[in-house]
Regions:
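Polytopic alpha-helical membrane-helix bundles and their juxtamembrane interface segments
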Residues: 1-41, 50-157
């Protein structure tokens, strides 16, 4: 696939790393094994996609089996994380969560994260083609900034 470079794979690794660190921080506070499994599954999905792009960039081999599980693995991971919050609802100090989310500057980072993820959803639905390197660059830059905003929001909370 033309235009899939090592640089694109490395940029794709930024949101995976930012999201992974953010999930480790949340998992440490939540302490739910279900959340940890969901977070690990979501991060593993991202790592598979980064590996796919790295192999494309270095050896020009399209190992689609590394890319195909991304959406189902990520969705399953997000579902497990959501279920962990429902199951542990009474154990979570929601006042502290709300206070952290609404604190400055965390609130700005969380608003930016939500806005960027919304924009990414729109972009993927209306403009994105998986085989288009330019579209992948755009999506990865949006995602890298967005997931870094999530991480910064959590760090400042």
């Amino acid at each position: 696939m033309e235009g899939f470079t090592v640089g694109l794979a490395l940029v794709d690794a930024i949101p995976v790393l930012s999201f992974g660190i953010a999930m480790v921080i949340i998992a440490g506070k939540v302490g739910s094994p279900l959340f940890m499994v969901g977070a690990a599954l979501s991060v593993l999905a991202g790592c598979c996609k980064v590996a796919w792009k790295l192999i494309l960039g270095i050896w020009k081999k399209d190992l689609r089996w590394l890319n195909k599980p991304f959406v189902p693995m990520q969705a399953a991971g997000f579902l497990l994380m959501a279920i962990s919050f429902v199951v542990g609802f009474g154990k979570i100090n929601w006042a502290a969560v709300g206070s952290g989310i609404l604190s400055f500057p965390s609130a700005l980072f969380f608003v930016a994260w939500i806005g960027l993820m919304g924009f990414m959803g729109w972009f993927r639905k209306h403009k994105f083609k998986n085989e288009d390197a330019k579209a992948n660059w755009t999506a990865q830059i949006i995602n890298a900034v967005g997931q870094t905003c999530l991480l910064l929001g959590i760090l400042f909370a």
